[in-house]
Amino acid sequence: MLFLLSPAKSLDYDTPPHVSTYTKPLFTRQSAELIDVLQTKTPQQISTLMKLSDALSGLNVARYQAWSPKFTAKNSKQAVLAFNGDVYGGLDAKTLSEQQLGWAQEHVCILSGLYGVLRPLDWMQPYRLEMGTALATGQGKNLYQFWGSQIADYLNQRAAAHTSPVIVNLASEEYFKAVDRKALKARVVSCVFEEFRAGKYKIISFMAKRARGLMVRYATEHKLLTVRKLEGFDAEGYRFDPAASQADRLVFRRRQAA
């Protein structure tokens, strides 16, 4: 069983990693191609393309210029420890043991506009490149056309090696769209997290993001290998709702945050 996550805009390269184990990203040739395109852009062009402030566009232009095909402990950090948004607050990878991170390495994939797919312990240099960015390359007008079926092909390869070839989609729509569903062979199961507000259950974005990270942590701590086991997820007050769920759409609800 493979768990898919989106990356985060917020990054933490200040906190030293608590583990030294790392792997190299798999799609560095493609990343270098994208960096070559990004390095031709001015801060104003990046600001317009990505809808960023002048300060953020300047920061990311500097990141593109500094990016190197050689990944080192000085310019990189393990992806799951570098990302720092709502999802990663729920996952809280800095408190996972090296053994638990090793399990996550085999069962978690982080989708990325620049890196395609990152494993948790893959070294990552800082960047900002949302998957929905309309960055024109030799492969087309946006990143979906750039990546094509490459991400799905890789996920097929990974899923086929598992006893349960299932992909648990915990990524956003923007990122999961980069997985070519026609090319993807594995069964896909999605998880939905809802809060009780004003008399009904609804998805609240930042809470749902945190819950996705909590789900991956739960799976990692319990070494879950089947969809049925996911139904036991109960972190921070969530409970599986069988009546609201379908075979490939698991709904978790809570009346109030625990």
Curated annotation (Swiss-Prot):
Record's signal peptide: none
Annotated Pfam families: H2O2_YaaD
Recorded superkingdom: Bacteria
One GO cellular component term noted in the UniProt record for this chain: cytosol
GO terms of biological process kind: response to hydroperoxide
InterPro entries: YaaA
PANTHER family membership: PEROXIDE STRESS RESISTANCE PROTEIN YAAA, PEROXIDE STRESS RESPONSE PROTEIN YAAA
Similarity comment text for this entry: Belongs to the UPF0246 family.
Protein name: UPF0246 protein Bpro_3713
Organism this protein belongs to: Polaromonas sp. (strain JS666 / ATCC BAA-500)
